[in-house]
Amino acid sequence: MFNKTMVATGVAIAVAAMPVVAEEGSFMDELEISGELKNESAIFTKSGTTVGAASAHDNRDMLKSETSIRLFVNGLAGESSEWHAEIRPVRDTQAVDGYKGHENYSQQDFLRELYVDTTAGEDDAVSLRIGKQQVVWGTADGMKLLDIINPTDYREMAQNSMDESRIPVWMVNAETDLEDGSNLQLVISQPRENVFAGLNRNINTVARVNNTTNGGDLTTGSGHDQGHAFMMKGVDTITGKTNGFLNIAPDIGSVALGFSGQFTAAGLQGTTNMTVAQFQKMTNAQLNARPWPASATSITGAIAGGSDGTQIMNAFAGNYDTNLNAATSANDYAVVKDSAFEYMDNATFATFDAFVNASSQYTYDMPSDSDVDAAVRIKRSLDNGLNYSLNYSYNYDKNPIINLSWRGANDVELTPTETINHFNGAGAVVAGTGVAGYAYSTTTLTLADSGGQAYGAVAGLAPTLRFEQTVERAHNIGSAMDYAVDTESLGAVVLRGEFLYQKDVYQPVMNLDKLSIGNLTEALKMEQTNRFKYVLGADITVMTNMMVSAQFIQDRNLDHIDNGNNFTADYATMHMTNGFNKAEENKEFYSLFFSKPFGAEQQHRWNNIIMFEENGGKWNRFDVEYSFNDELIGMFEYDKYWGDENTQFGQLEASSNLQLGLKYIF
């Protein structure tokens, strides 16, 4: 496997070099060991509830208490090679489970780096770095465009430095200088994906199902990474305890079980003439006027108690801890849609027959360790001062996608079929929309395998809604350039740009019409798109030594979908509370970055970056490093998020925080 091969290669070279080193002294004498011991503690600076959290926090509550060691070890590997290792034990006592300590392929990986530097070819013209490492291609402030060789750990959004948040992977990194002065770089690397709170490789893959006899809730506490301060709404929609459809699906299955026998004695399959909205909008008097079968004891008992349709629905849904039905009465049902049954308003009760005792399951279809990503870059500096690079990679896209499907026995895929029926005002079937007495139509969903075997209560077979996490290959073609211009008033101004065209990446596409009839697998689909992203920046130095950098950033979705209720959703913020937030076709960001040393010997430094996001999201980070001496450094950082709550930054307003740290260098 790829990673084991790399480990073996690095270790073998180091071991082979030991006798050579031993000729001049002990192995340990030849090692260079340095490092840093650091503690960072953070508090919330705003009371509130972070996305998906079960309860609110108060201002000044602890967010983080992380102690870590970064140990750097360098040694010789033969006469012309060297090896390097970075080891980082870490513990955060305030983190949620899964984030407290070591985690492979994350920011807290115990073995951050392990590689060998050597040369090959005639006159050692090719420099090789083999092993676990980072390769940095992009230099934009606050975001990554060309910097896509390594994945990123977004456990603290963009607060951590690029060096800290970048996830090292195993790779072969080869560079050589060409005759015209250009530098050619080839990277063959292990494919790994970005890591987000709530969307990673630690999600429980056991099927989630409630009691199939009495509908008892057996899936409580199933939210992934609940309480993490940097959970985003888009992730909460997938794996969140309350709003995540991974956990909503089995609860819908249990509510459907409760419906059985309530509308007809024979079950739900024949109830094609009533939708969720029709039922929930009924007053108590309207319900009381309808005939109910003798088996409908739950409904008739509630009617006798004065309940309307929404209140009866809440009696069924209230037994579960997910966001099934937020309305409180027939008067406010779906006035503002923010719960599952409000979005599934056109689903018939016959559709719920297919959902009876449904389960859900999270699965992974990720690249194996024998798969590789490939990237090549050529960069050059011209005599006129222009520096540029041309970049290409064919890699698994770093952002994971989620594919939904219904599954049956032996993992067979089920096909949803929509059937339209027409009715008169009394709910009796009519032949079509043009016949006398026609009043309304409904669409009923059924599930069956390729052999025609139906699933549902009548069939006696329960389906499973699968959430499959995967990544897909994409082509990335990019360029970076910078050029210094001397001006009379501002001095030297560095103009720079990064440009990236991505082919065959994926976007989440939401279809609210499909969701309204309960066709969940067609409601959220991942579809191919092409994107063009770029950053234009300018850097100047003012007030003797203060660096000022301004950036304009745009992400253009070249296959954006905006067709009424069928649209490209914003992956970061799509949520039941905002109509699954439609994405911008051309998303823009603006940033300003300031950096200045201070002190008698300019030994301290402060930095400030502020980013403005289209539609009103804002983030500002102010940080200071204060050197008490050469070994001891104090750190201060304040991160403030604010603005529209349905933006990437604005949704994190309750996560605003202040951090204090102390770092000892040895």
What are the language-model segments listed below?
Residues D61-T67, Q107-R112, R166-W170, S370-A374, ...:
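Residues that define the transmembrane beta-barrel architecture of outer-membrane proteins
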Residues L31, E79-W83, D124-L128, G181-L184, ...:
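Repeated loop/turn-to-beta-strand initiation elements of outer-membrane beta-barrel proteins
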Residues E24-T50, W83-A85, W606:
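Transmembrane beta-strand segments of Gram-negative outer membrane beta-barrel proteins
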Residues F27, G75-E79, A120-E122, R166, ...:
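Outer-membrane beta-barrel strand-turn architecture
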Residues N39-T45, P89-T93, Q134-V136, I188-N194, ...:
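Transmembrane beta-strands of outer-membrane beta-barrel pores
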Residues P151-Y154, L592, E653-F666:
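Outer-membrane beta-barrel "beta-signal"
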